[in-house]
From Swiss-Prot:
Observed effect of gene inactivation: Deletion of the gene results in increased resistance to antibiotics and detergents.
Inhibition and activation profile: DNA binding is affected significantly by increasing the NaCl concentration.
Swiss-Prot/TrEMBL keywords: DNA-binding, Repressor, Transcription, Transcription regulation
UniProt function note: Controls the permeability of the cell envelope to hydrophobic compounds such as antibiotics and detergents. Represses transcription of the mtrCDE-encoded efflux pump by binding within the mtrCDE promoter. Also negatively regulates the expression of farR, by binding to its promoter region, leading indirectly to the positive regulation of expression of the farAB-encoded efflux pump.
PANTHER family per the UniProt record, alphabetical: ACREF/ENVCD OPERON REPRESSOR-RELATED, ACREF_ENVCD OPERON REPRESSOR-RELATED
Protein name: HTH-type transcriptional regulator MtrR
Signal peptide (residue range): none
Listed GO MF terms: DNA binding
InterPro entries per UniProt: DNA-bd_HTH_TetR-type_CS, Homeodomain-like_sf, HTH-type_Tx_Regulator, HTH_TetR, Tet_transcr_reg_TetR-rel_C_sf, Tscrpt_reg_MAATS_C
Species the sequence originates in: Neisseria gonorrhoeae
Binding partners and assembly: Homodimer. Binds to DNA as a pair of dimers.
Miscellaneous information on this protein: The MtrA and MtrR-binding sites are sterically close and addition of an effector increases the affinity of MtrA for the mtrCDE promoter such that MtrR binding is negatively impacted.
HTH tetR-type domain boundaries: 9-69
DNA-binding region positions on the chain: 32-51
Length: 210
């Protein structure tokens, strides 16, 4: 039984990686389940045993990346000296390092930013992406709340605006890097952008409640 469960998990992982490669090559809307099954070297029936549809597969892939990031955050928290605000900085720096060095993270975010077509056909996939993005907004809000409590940030910080500012900065940097054909050195640029962003969160009056 244990061997069967292990084999099933390996097959599921193999299917997710096949989906990642196919989505990366063709985009989500133009990829069929049959193409994913062929890329994985399994029957369509075997794919359906693990995933109900393409949206279910994308959701599992999204969750896999989120779990990886969560594990890295936990490791950063264990390794870093200081509170959640310091950990947040380390987490962001490590995220952009992985974006360049980890093939799975690179391809997934490339799909998310460039190949996740906003069409009626793709509505369910877009809804899944928004669901996960909402979860990360909540996590960022929690980081800001703790930073305020620890006096790393001002007690009159406008957290709603701050979350929008953070997401806009980070998403904008990722999109710009991908859409420009990686025309600038992300390894040099990301730490500077993160530093500017965090300095503004700590000091800029426009991020305080009116």
């Amino acid at each position: 039984m244990r061997k069967t469960k292990t084999e099933a998990l390996k097959t599921k992982e193999h299917l997710m990686l096949a989906a990642l490669e196919t989505f990366y090559r063709k985009g989500i809307a133009r990829t069929s389940l049959n193409e994913i099954a062929q890329a994985a070297g399994v029957t369509r029936g075997a794919l359906y045993w693990h995933f109900k549809n393409k949206e279910d597969l994308f959701d599992a892939l999204f969750q896999r990346i989120c779990d990886d990031i969560e594990n890295c955050i936990a490791q950063d928290a264990a390794d870093a000296e200081g509170g959640s605000w310091t950990v947040f900085r380390h987490t962001l720096l490590h995220f952009f390092e992985r974006l360049q060095s980890n093939d799975i993270h690179y391809k997934f975010h490339n799909i998310l930013f460039l190949k996740c077509e906003h069409t009626e056909q793709n509505a369910a996939v877009i809804a899944i992406a928004r669901k996960h993005q909402a979860i990360w907004r909540e996590k960022i809000t929690a980081v800001l709340t703790e930073a305020v409590e620890n006096q790393d940030l001002a007690d009159d910080l406008d957290k709603e605006t701050a979350v929008i500012f953070i997401k806009s900065t980070l998403d904008g940097l990722i999109w710009r890097w991908f859409s420009s054909g990686e025309s600038f050195d992300l390894g040099k640029t990301a730490p500077r952008i993160i530093g500017i962003m965090m300095d503004n969160l700590e000091n800029h009056p426009c991020l305080r409640r009116k």
